[in-house]
């Protein structure tokens, strides 16, 4: 599904933190699918994610990892003060 657009909530959970291990498994140890067109990190950076996190450092990391064009504002509760999110990505 090359045109499928994915949104992973809450800064994509732990994926940005373990994607280096996934890349290593696929590219160095030759485990997993053999016909990937791109590395796991490239696939992960092509998704969209929301910036719902109570930790400003996590929001900043998401901004650096995904880039501002892949971050979405969303809310299911006033969990994080919007001012914190704006301050972190400004």
Predicted features, each with a name:
Residues 1:
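Basic phosphate/pyrophosphate-binding loop/patch that engages nucleotide-derived ligands
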Residues 5-90:
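H/E-rich (His + Asp/Glu) clusters that bind or coordinate divalent metals
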